[in-house]
């Protein structure tokens, strides 16, 4: 997989083309991604680059992590991410920023969706509600039957039921990079990306481009 970066979702806005067309965009701040380790086929069996982003107090870092960051001579970050690398070499301490992308490029954006707590089947799986009248009593939003009788005598795995909704890893594919602001380390991506404002997102070149 081609190298990507870890950024922070700043929110949504819109920009206008020269023809006056409004384009909804998500603003992603690409803080400098500091390389903490470069893995190669000789020592690790595969090629990858490990990066960290943001800052974290020394008291909040384990001794193992502190030693890892100290060996790379970089400040401790709030998260560590690894990207497979097909070509090119990086050294510990190198910085990766928004300039690796260009306007018009397609990217995949991964983030953690907003948590919605315990949700019923209508909200979680788009089930239709039952009749409001015609003899229905207190069963307007219930899912209905969840299986058969003695055969098979169980509920199949994967059955759509009520449960915790959101707060899971979500990837939106093939979003267009509308603008790259290298001076302010901002990436403007067409459309919406997963997660709440201020959340970490991973931006990679699109696998289906």
Swiss-Prot record:
Similarity remark: Belongs to the universal ribosomal protein uL3 family.
GO cellular component annotations of the record: cytosolic large ribosomal subunit
GO biological process, one term: translation
Name under which the protein is recorded: Large ribosomal subunit protein uL3
Keyword rRNA-binding: yes
Post-translation changes: Methylated by PrmB.
NCBIfam families named in the record: L3_bact
Protein species of origin: Ectopseudomonas mendocina (strain ymp) (Pseudomonas mendocina)
Extent of the signal sequence: none
SUPFAM superfamilies named among the record's database cross-references: Translation proteins
Sequence positions bearing N5-methylglutamine: 150
Keywords tagged on the record: Methylation, Ribonucleoprotein, Ribosomal protein, RNA-binding, rRNA-binding
Pfam families (UniProt xref): Ribosomal_L3
Function: One of the primary rRNA binding proteins, it binds directly near the 3'-end of the 23S rRNA, where it nucleates assembly of the 50S subunit.
Known partners and oligomeric status: Part of the 50S ribosomal subunit. Forms a cluster with proteins L14 and L19.
Recorded GO MF terms: rRNA binding; structural constituent of ribosome
PANTHER family for the chain: 50S RIBOSOMAL PROTEIN L3 (PTHR11229), LARGE RIBOSOMAL SUBUNIT PROTEIN UL3C (PTHR11229:SF16)
């Amino acid at each position: 997989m081609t190298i990507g970066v870890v950024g922070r979702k700043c929110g949504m806005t819109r920009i206008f083309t020269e023809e006056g067309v409004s384009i909804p965009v998500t603003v992603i701040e690409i803080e400098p991604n500091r390389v903490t380790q470069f893995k190669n086929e000789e020592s690790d069996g595969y090629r990858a680059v490990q990066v960290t982003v943001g800052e974290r107090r020394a008291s909040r870092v384990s001794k193992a992590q502190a030693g890892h960051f100290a060996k790379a001579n970089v400040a401790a970050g709030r998260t560590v991410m690894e990207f497979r690398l097909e070509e090119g070499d990086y050294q510990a301490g190198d910085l990766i920023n928004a300039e690796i992308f260009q306007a018009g490029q397609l990217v995949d954006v991964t983030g953690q969706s907003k948590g919605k707590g315990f949700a019923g089947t209508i909200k979680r799986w788009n089930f239709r509600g039952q009749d409001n009248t015609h003899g229905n009593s207190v069963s307007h939003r219930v899912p209905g039957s969840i299986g058969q009788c003695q055969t098979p005598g169980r509920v199949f795995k994967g059955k759509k039921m009520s449960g915790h909704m959101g707060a899971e890893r979500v990837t939106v594919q093939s979003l267009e990079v509308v603008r790259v602001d290298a001076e302010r380390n901002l990436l403007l991506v067409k459309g919406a990306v997963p997660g709440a404002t201020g959340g970490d997102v991973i931006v990679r070149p699109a696998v289906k481009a």
